[in-house]
From Swiss-Prot:
A Pfam family reported for this protein in Swiss-Prot or TrEMBL: COX2
InterPro entries in the cross-refs: CcO_II (IPR045187), CcO_II-like_C (IPR002429), CcO_II_C (IPR034210), Copper_CuA (IPR001505), Cupredoxin (IPR008972), Cyt_c_oxidase_su2 (IPR014222), Cyt_c_oxidase_su2_TM_dom (IPR011759), Cyt_c_oxidase_su2_TM_sf (IPR036257)
GN (gene name): COX2
Binding site residues for Cu cation A1: 187, 222, 226, 233
Principal location listed in the UniProt entry: mitochondrion
Name the record gives this protein: Cytochrome c oxidase subunit 2
Cofactors demanded by this protein: Cu cation
Catalytic reaction(s) noted: 4 Fe(II)-[cytochrome c] + O2 + 8 H(+)(in) = 4 Fe(III)-[cytochrome c] + 2 H2O + 4 H(+)(out)
Self-association state and partner proteins as the record states: Component of the cytochrome c oxidase (complex IV, CIV), a multisubunit enzyme composed of a catalytic core of 3 subunits and several supernumerary subunits. The complex exists as a monomer or a dimer and forms supercomplexes (SCs) in the inner mitochondrial membrane with ubiquinol-cytochrome c oxidoreductase (cytochrome b-c1 complex, complex III, CIII).
Family of this protein: Belongs to the cytochrome c oxidase subunit 2 family.
Keywords noted in UniProt: Copper, Electron transport, Magnesium, Membrane, Metal-binding, Mitochondrion, Mitochondrion inner membrane, Respiratory chain, Translocase, Transmembrane, Transmembrane helix, Transport
Molecular function GO labels: copper ion binding; cytochrome-c oxidase activity
BP-aspect Gene Ontology terms: ATP synthesis coupled electron transport
Coiled-coil boundaries: none
Source species of the chain: Cyanidium caldarium
Amino acid sequence: MKFFFFSFINYKVLNDAARPWQIGFQDPATPIMEGIVNLHHDIIFFLIIIIIFVSWILFRTLFLFNSKTNPVAYNFSHGTFIELLWTLTPSLVLIGIAVPSFALLYSIDEIIDPAITIKAVGRQWYWSYEYSDYVNEENEFLAFHSYILPEEDLELGQFRLLEVDNRIIIPVNTHIRIIVTGADVIHSWAVPSLGVKCDAIPGRLNQISFFIKREGIYYGQCSEICGVNHGFMPIVIEAVSFDDYIRWVQNKILD
């Protein structure tokens, strides 16, 4: 009983990271992820109805049209109405699923007036970040590397294989653009609770955007097999208030 109680408490506090035996989504922190979760629920609704209907037809056919009940088979060559029905009905269902998914796909690719642009570079096996909107007195961009935190350096409550030495700090309620590329092999920058995943390809710049609605710490990982230490490339985003973000930028520039 204690285990389940504390698991529930941890779930409510640490709802922006994966938890043991999780089969659902992490709590959405962006409108995009909310749309993905809602689309999933809508599709599951249609899926349950289809499964129930098809199962009912299947069992009805097995019990009412077997060799004992109907020793002589009916001689049907075709049925125009039923053929139209089983062609049009799935088409309408697919259209009903496709229309909202197209709108969601379009909104994912839309870049809305980003206030902050961050460049993420995938390397074997760590991430580098560059805040190109800010420069110090020596005309250098605000930039840093982000390595996985060794297990012996973890503090109580921190996650093994998910913590880093330098987090990405961004403000809430702000349109953020991430430009993603790779320095050596193909990586993938992904944060599930934000609903973002973007391939980091050497020689190519890809971009994604998001709008975080609440403060918190969001965890992700490289999602493209990139070598022996692929599993040691975590991503940690800390969303803070705008005032805290400005203070962090000032301290970083002074450093």
